[in-house]
Amino acid sequence: MFGLGTMEMVIILVIVLVIFGAGKLPKVMGDMGRGVKSFKKAMNAEDDAPAEPEVSKPAAAESTEKKDA
């Protein structure tokens, strides 16, 4: 996962604990989880939406009939 080993994850966790404190950590993680869930939901909703067919206007085609001069 992102090339992070166990020691790197432990160091990151300790830094997060120092910054936010043990009391706020569950709230911060819950908010982060809701954000990720909302992001995934939005991405799936975009994939589920039917693609609107592209309507191309016909180019100004010249008449194939020969015009009498």
UniProtKB/Swiss-Prot annotation:
Its main location: membrane. Belongs to the TatA/E family. HAMAP family: TatA_E. One of its GO terms (molecular function) is protein transmembrane transporter activity. This is Sec-independent protein translocase protein TatA. GO terms for cellular component: TAT protein transport complex. Part of the twin-arginine translocation (Tat) system that transports large folded proteins containing a characteristic twin-arginine motif in their signal peptide across membranes. TatA could form the protein-conducting channel of the Tat system. Pfam families: TatA_B_E (PF02416). InterPro entries: TatA/B/E, TatA/E. The gene is tatA. The keyword Cell membrane applies. Signal peptide: none annotated. The Tat system comprises two distinct complexes: a TatABC complex, containing multiple copies of TatA, TatB and TatC subunits, and a separate TatA complex, containing only TatA subunits. Substrates initially bind to the TatABC complex, which probably triggers association of the separate TatA complex to form the active translocon. The chain crosses the membrane at residues 1-21. It is found in: Cell inner membrane. It is a single-pass membrane protein. Residues 44-69 are annotated as: Disordered. Keywords: Cell inner membrane, Cell membrane, Membrane, Protein transport, Translocation, Transmembrane, Transmembrane helix, Transport. One of its GO terms (biological process) is protein transport by the Tat complex. The keyword GTP-binding does not apply. It comes from the Bacteria.
